[in-house]
């Protein structure tokens, strides 16, 4: 992709904007960055980029900078943003940071991609551990720390041969030619529907992960996902399933307590290879075992040895606030899954424990929690609700779990989490799990899910003395 002399507009100064601008400048482009928020953080970022030669405009952009012939947008920017509408009207190509990284990547660099509603970060981290255990120069990138553009263009001793790429529906929406060697859709549930305009375009965005020639790896337990892979992927590329069931030929799955590969073997009809045991997967919740199988399928697609899959799983350390055990107090386990910000993630978390005091609530973003409550009702010892939309959860609980005691915490100040944890401790009995799996976003009370999880863990430790 030739960029020298081109006039490129970059939208946004968030996580992806600055590294995209730096990469474009390095390739000789004339760069203008537009950012709607004029605050201290963005003024400092703007100062740094101006020193490198970029033009930066702070304040809500309404027009496309004159002469622009390419737009690289930050993934969260909606297609109806005025500057992007102006680009479309002018016939100017709009791509995302991932698409730019793909076009500029060095020859021979392999991409293995993961998308889905929940579990993406865990899966790419597991994959990274497997690849490194096999001696590969590999890095997990995307929403997990290192921006894709930085990793793809790193050179010298920092160059990466394989990228385990976490891709959101936003990033995929703005991608046109990305063709990973293999890609997995690990699950799909309603999320970001306001941005995409409904479930069908959301699913179609996810399916763009299957480029021409991409090995299609899909959760075989979900017929809708298999259909998505069949209808949107390359029909000439292999289709590999994974599930928690005994695998059929061409799948990865479970045989008793063994993770088994019947896809990447010489004769899938008659052969199977043991990859690991359930004891190698941490935590051993069902949805996390599915993540491990997806990661294993991606690793095996490029010939990673079975022993490296096992070693990688053993070396893997879960990310904070994802089914993280905080403490055991008086026989009660306290678990932080603050990252469970939607109903699908909360349902998976709740399914991992037989008897739960559930801490839930926050911003539901218009999601329907009726099915979640109905599904979880038999596991609930009690519920503690907090946050702006807790009344919606209360209504669902009153209808589908009327026998379950509910404590409603109305306060939203710094002491709210202490009251929440204390109430949960009163409801819990020996052998129970107090589980923070809010099924909601956190911004009504906290900066993000991390701050919410840290507040929970802090109050649990205080309870332990």
Curated annotation (Swiss-Prot):
Keyword presence, Ligase: yes
Superkingdom per UniProt: Bacteria
Alphabetical list of HAMAP family matching this protein: MurD
Origin species: Thermobifida fusca (strain YX)
Protein name, per record: UDP-N-acetylmuramoylalanine--D-glutamate ligase
Enzyme class: ligase
Family annotation (Pfam families): Mur_ligase_C, Mur_ligase_M, MurD-like_N
Keywords: ATP-binding, Cell cycle, Cell division, Cell shape, Cell wall biogenesis/degradation, Cytoplasm, Ligase, Nucleotide-binding, Peptidoglycan synthesis
Binding site for ATP: 116-122
Biological process annotations from GO: cell division; cell wall organization; peptidoglycan biosynthetic process; regulation of cell shape
GO molecular function terms attached to this record: ATP binding; UDP-N-acetylmuramoylalanine-D-glutamate ligase activity
Database matches in InterPro entries: Mur-like_cat_sf, Mur_ligase_C, Mur_ligase_C_dom_sf, Mur_ligase_cen, MurD
Catalysis performed (reactions): UDP-N-acetyl-alpha-D-muramoyl-L-alanine + D-glutamate + ATP = UDP-N-acetyl-alpha-D-muramoyl-L-alanyl-D-glutamate + ADP + phosphate + H(+)
SUPFAM superfamilies named in the record: MurCD N-terminal domain, MurD-like peptide ligases, catalytic domain, MurD-like peptide ligases, peptide-binding domain
NCBIfam families in the record: murD
């Amino acid at each position: 992709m030739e960029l020298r002399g081109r006039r490129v507009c970059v939208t946004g100064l968030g996580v992806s904007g600055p590294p995209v601008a730096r990469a474009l400048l390095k390739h000789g482009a004339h760069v203008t960055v537009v950012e709607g928020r004029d605050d201290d953080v963005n003024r400092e970022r703007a100062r740094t980029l101006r020193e490198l030669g970029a033009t930066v405009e702070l304040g809500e952009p309404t027009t496309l900078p004159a002469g622009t012939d390419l737009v690289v947008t930050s993934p969260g920017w909606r297609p109806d943003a005025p500057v992007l509408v102006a680009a479309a009207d002018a016939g100017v190509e709009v791509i995302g940071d991932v698409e730019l990284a793909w076009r500029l990547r060095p020859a021979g660099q392999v991409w293995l991609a993961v998308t889905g509603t929940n579990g993406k970060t865990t899966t790419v981290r597991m994959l990274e551990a497997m690849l490194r255990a096999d001696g590969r120069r590999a890095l997990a990138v995307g929403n997990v720390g290192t921006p894709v553009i930085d990793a793809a263009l790193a050179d010298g001793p920092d160059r990466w041969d394989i990228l385990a790429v976490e891709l959101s529906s936003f990033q995929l929406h703005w991608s046109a030619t990305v063709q990973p060697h293999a890609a997995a859709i690990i699950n799909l549930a309603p999320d970001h529907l306001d941005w995409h305009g409904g479930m069908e375009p959301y699913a179609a965005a996810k399916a763009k992960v299957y480029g021409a020639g991409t090995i299609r790896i899909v959760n075989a337990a979900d017929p809708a996902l298999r259909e998505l892979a069949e209808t949107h992927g390359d029909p000439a590329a292999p289709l590999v399933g994974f599930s928690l069931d005994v695998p059929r030929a061409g799948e990865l799955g479970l045989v008793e307590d063994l993770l088994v590969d019947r896809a990447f073997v010489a004769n899938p009809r008659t052969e199977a290879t043991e990859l690991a045991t359930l004891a190698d997967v941490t935590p051993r919740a069902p949805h996390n075992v599915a993540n491990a199988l997806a990661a294993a399928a991606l690793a095996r697609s490029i010939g990673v040895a079975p022993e490296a899959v096992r070693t990688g799983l053993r070396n893997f350390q879960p990310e904070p606030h994802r089914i993280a055990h905080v403490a055991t107090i008086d026989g009660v386990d306290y678990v932080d899954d603050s990252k469970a910000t939607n109903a699908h993630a909360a349902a998976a978390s709740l399914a991992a424990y037989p008897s739960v005091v559930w801490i839930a609530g926050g911003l539901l973003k218009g999601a329907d929690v009726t099915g979640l409550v109905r599904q979880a009702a038999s596991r609930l010892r009690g519920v503690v609700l907090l946050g702006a939309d807790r009344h919606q959860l209360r209504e669902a609980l009153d209808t589908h779990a009327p026998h379950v005691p509910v404590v409603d915490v109305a306060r939203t100040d710094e002491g709210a989490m202490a009251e929440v944890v204390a109430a949960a401790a009163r409801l819990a009995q020996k052998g129970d799990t107090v589980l923070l799996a809010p099924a909601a976003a956190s911004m009504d009370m906290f900066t993000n899910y991390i701050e919410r999880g840290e507040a929970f863990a802090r109050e649990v430790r205080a309870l332990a003395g």
